[in-house]
Amino acid sequence: MLIQENLSIQDKLKILTDAAKYDVACTSSGVKRKGKAGSIGNTSEAGICHSFAADGRCISLLKILFTNQCIYDCKYCVNRCSNDVVRTAFTPDEVCRLTIEFYRRNYIEGLFLSSGILYNANHTMEQIYETLYKLRNQWCFNGYIHVKAIPGADAELVERTGFLADRMSINLELPTAEGLKNLAPGKTRDKILAPMRQIQQGISVSSHLLGYDRGYKKPYSTERAGFAGGAALIRPELAGGPGAALDRTISAGTMKQGAARGMIGAAQGMAGAAQEVAGGNPLKDMHSESHVGNHSKGLKSRLVLPASQYKKSAFVPAGQSTQMIVGATPENDYQMMSVTQSLYRNFGLKRVFYSAYIPVNEDSCLPSLPDGPPLLREHRLYQADWLLRFYGFRAEELLSEDRPNFNVFLDPKCDWALRHLEGFPVEVNLAPYDQLLRVPGMGVKSASRIVAARRSGRLGFEDLKKMGVVLKRARYFITCSGRMMEGARLDQDYITNCLVGDEQRARWDIEHRDSFRQLSLFDDMHMEMPVTRDDHYAAAAGHF
């Protein structure tokens, strides 16, 4: 490890921005806060990330590491302690000056601050807290801040940082505890989930005390995968977890004593519970298990600050997120999505990010990737993640143990529809909103427009096109006034050929020679519209 001292701030910036490029930033701030007199900066709920790098990563935030020094030796990480790279660290004042100067030049709209572990978790978290405190109170920076919580840090440090940040995140790193043990032996699932639960509880108390629901409203407010505060939705046995207990306390307090007194009582009760275990090991009641959802029963409240603090300012108003590496361990897509669903439902996460594994180190435990990083797989996981959060799908609907991976040629929604043709075609003039959402080519906005527009008259295919429906996909799964679009028919092979194309279908048949498919009279592609070169490119990119 080569620790460089007396480096200029420009040299540090070059080293620590490059070291942070593998950490996934947020795609939108998720919180809206207007500017105020005496302060600079504001946050925009939709679009803090305006531009993307060539590899698709967001570059509109100042994304840096506080330090690339680290005590851990994670096999996949470029900053692992065994790597012979130049090490350096910012000071809190340097991060503040950089953020303000970049903001004044209109280079950025916010800060994304992560870090390696410098000396120990508490020391690193103290430095991050000092940085945010100075930015908010001395430099009067009112812009967006996304900060990484350090696993294993003191609960009070994490909690105080949450009142200064807009979003916090703790990287889950890998979907299973076994994978984490193999590739990141210094980290444990317990250390990662403890602050994640603490942030969830703080968000829930703060949102009820201040009267907001994490700043956004989405469909399926009580059933969708990522609804606020849900600790017991994925499995009934999780009903005894601390998140569910908090929900019950809040509900009871609201009904019996009024909203304000109920929220204060809940917060005080959780703070008292945290003080009871403060004398011992705060992780002693947590049990190491391979599936993330099972941890909810052992996690206790770790909120330390009094309820009065939660009444003054919002705690992590943009919610928390996490990141998983795709392709570094042998878990399949079904396992990845099951863990994602569990995180949304048990920990109330706002986003789960996926990062295709990029080999930066040589190690016998790491996979070889002759075809490069699994970017298409990452793309499919993001598409499925969207279906979980906004379309009412469940992981077990999209995949199963018999079909554990996503179709590389079709997006998850089209693939699901082709396997459930018994539910199609859907009559757009009569179908409920939930059913419209499951039609390929229809999104949340277009489905809402259809429901609103059909009150004043019957809709045709031209009307749907004007509303934003992608008829190239939707035409095979809908009817207007009882009629399908001209040239479309409800046949699995026909629809698959039209969506994927002859060249991609042939490739699929070669790669799946053990799969059996009944021959059809309609396999002659000369009977149908010719497939263009642009169609081949679009199918290969997953745009169909």
Positions of PLM-derived features:
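Conserved, mostly hydrophobic/aromatic
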Residues: 61, 74, 113, 170, ...
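Canonical Radical SAM [4Fe-4S] cluster-binding loop centered on the CxxxCxxC motif
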Residues: 64-93
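Conserved AdoMet/S-adenosylmethionine-binding subsite of the radical SAM
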Residues: 96, 119-391
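Short, charged beta->alpha transition segments
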Residues: 62-64, 93-104, 308-309
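Long, highly charged, low-complexity intrinsically disordered interaction regions
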Residues: 362-437, 473-526, 532, 543
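Short Fe-S-cluster ligation motifs
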Residues: 98-114, 384
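Flexible, acidic/Gly-rich N-terminal and inter-domain linker regions that tether
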Residues: 1-69, 470, 478, 486, ...
